């Protein structure tokens, strides 16, 4: 009887763990979608509120799209990995008259009769897929962190003069409430409201009370976009990438199936993200040195 109860409890815990992992993946997908949507909202609000350039909007939207779904499928990466290897293979064909010619891209006879070549090719393809994913991750890291840091530095070094369209006629009361219409002087203002580029006019979006408060809000938007994009990058390119990140195991047994809301969706250690990128750079340097020495 005790053996039956212990077996039933073991089967129940295994079933709960399986359902728990399925619920966890579902929550992870929802988390990625929500972070991606939040990033698009912040990028759009910054463009609308502070009249950022269209190129800034397009660049950040492209980066946001790439880090939301960073890697192609393994099947596509495997085709890319085997493309160069197939081009380097040559096969020998015998023409009438006994003349032999090598054809590039043709399987050699030694590959056709070697049973171990398939397993070796599989290992080589897996290594190539991991290498390509790490190269993609390194590129997106610079697009996510380096590009956002560049925008922040440029925003601090070159602040926006929000009162330039007023031509020195700054109001003394609580903000520019009754600025003349742009249809008479074309100063880029409409009753104190900003007129953005690309035929965009936000009704009710007034000028800030001072240049300091306006530029401070812009810097806060820049940091918010940086935090959201770097968190999304850490989630999609490190934690959920199945490359070199090992999620810490739970000390307590999984007694829940995830439907009670007790689910640890993901742990996002930002310091391990930096370590993973630095390790990718060291591995690439070692591979280049090894290839040069050969």
Curated annotation (Swiss-Prot):
Residues 1-139, 237-294 are cytoplasmic. It comes from the Eukaryota. One of its GO terms (cellular component) is endoplasmic reticulum. Its main location: Golgi. One of its GO terms (biological process) is localization within membrane. Induction: Expression is regulated by the metabolic and meiotic transcriptional regulator UME6. Component of the Golgi/endosome-localized DSC E3 ligase complex composed of at least TUL1, DSC2, DSC3, UBX3, CDC48 and GLD1. Component of the Golgi/endosome-localized DSC E3 ubiquitin ligase complex involved in the targeting of the DSC complex to the Golgi apparatus and endosome membranes via the AP3 pathway to ubiquinate Golgi/endosome membrane proteins. Competes with VLD1 to determine the subcellular localizations of the DSC complex. May be required for cell cycle progression. This is Golgi/endosome-localized DSC protein 1. It comes from Saccharomyces cerevisiae (strain ATCC 204508 / S288c). The lineage of its organism: Eukaryota, Fungi, Dikarya, Ascomycota, Saccharomycotina.
């Amino acid at each position: 009887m005790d053996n039956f109860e212990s077996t039933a409890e073991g089967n129940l815990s295994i079933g709960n763990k399986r359902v728990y992992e399925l619920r966890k993946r579902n929550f992870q997908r929802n988390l990625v979608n929500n972070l991606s949507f939040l990033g698009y909202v912040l990028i759009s609000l910054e463009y609308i509120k502070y009249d950022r350039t269209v190129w800034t909007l397009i660049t950040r939207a492209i980066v946001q799209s790439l880090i939301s779904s960073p890697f192609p499928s393994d099947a596509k990466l495997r085709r890319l990995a085997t493309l160069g290897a197939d081009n380097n293979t040559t096969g020998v064909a015998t023409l009438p008259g006994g003349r032999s010619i090598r054809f590039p891209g043709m399987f050699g006879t030694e590959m056709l009769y070697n049973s171990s070549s398939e397993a070796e090719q599989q290992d080589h393809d897996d290594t190539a897929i991991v290498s390509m994913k790490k190269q993609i991750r390194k590129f997106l890291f610079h697009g996510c962190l380096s590009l956002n840091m560049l925008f922040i530095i440029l925003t601090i070094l070159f602040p926006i003069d929000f009162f330039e369209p007023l031509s020195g006629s700054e109001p003394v009361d609580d903000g520019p409430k009754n600025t003349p219409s742009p249809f008479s002087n074309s100063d880029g203002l409409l009753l104190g409201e900003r007129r953005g580029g690309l035929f965009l006019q936000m009704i009710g979006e007034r000028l800030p009370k001072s240049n300091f408060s306006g530029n401070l809000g812009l810097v806060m938007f820049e940091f918010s976009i940086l935090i959201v994009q770097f968190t999304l990058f850490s989630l999609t390119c490190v934690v959920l990438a199945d490359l070199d990140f090992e999620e810490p195991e739970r000390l307590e047994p999984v007694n829940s199936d995830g439907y009670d809301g007790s689910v640890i969706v993901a742990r996002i250690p930002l310091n391990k993200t930096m370590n993973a990128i630095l390790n990718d750079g060291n591995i690439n340097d070692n591979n280049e040195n090894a290839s040069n020495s050969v």
